[in-house]
Regions:
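Elongated, amphipathic alpha-helical interaction scaffolds
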Residues: 1-141
């Protein structure tokens, strides 16, 4: 359940922008406990020109992804909660691969995108986040 207008707007905006290039689930439950993923995206048929027009969001949507948008700077606790959701989903997928006796690689597992307007250096350092300037622009960790 979305409590704030920004949360609803962010979820609906991401859904509208990503739906032409894949499947978007708003408010997907995580089974370990009742926690909700804001936006779970699975790429569909590629539309390169549309993805390109989305810029950075289009690049992020190149793989299965969890999007967790925040209106204000996220706290360490909120980031840990997002990481917990990612680990739960990855665990579910890995168990499914084992049950089906199929091989998995990191490309089949979702990526986590925590979207915040700002993050302090102390917060970034506390998670040992490092920029990947070869693949992403400044500000992406």
């Amino acid at each position: 359940m979305t409590r704030f207008i920004h949360d609803r707007f962010a979820k609906e905006y991401l859904s509208e922008m990503l739906s032409p290039i894949g499947t978007v689930n708003i408010g997907r439950d995580v089974t370990s406990e009742v926690r909700e993923i804001d936006v779970y995206f699975t790429p569909g048929t590629a539309i390169p020109e549309y993805s390109s027009s989305l810029g950075l969001l289009g690049k992020m949507a190149g793989t299965t992804a969890i999007f967790e948008p925040f209106r204000n700077p996220a706290s360490a606790s909120e980031i840990c909660s997002c990481l917990g959701k990612l680990l739960d989903v990855r665990g579910d997928k890995e168990r499914k691969f084992r049950r089906e006796n199929t091989r998995s690689d990191d490309e089949q597992l979702p990526k986590l995108w925590i979207l915040v307007p700002t993050a302090s250096k102390a917060l970034i350092d506390s998670f040992n986040a490092k920029p990947d300037t070869e693949n992403w622009m400044q500000g992406i960790y």
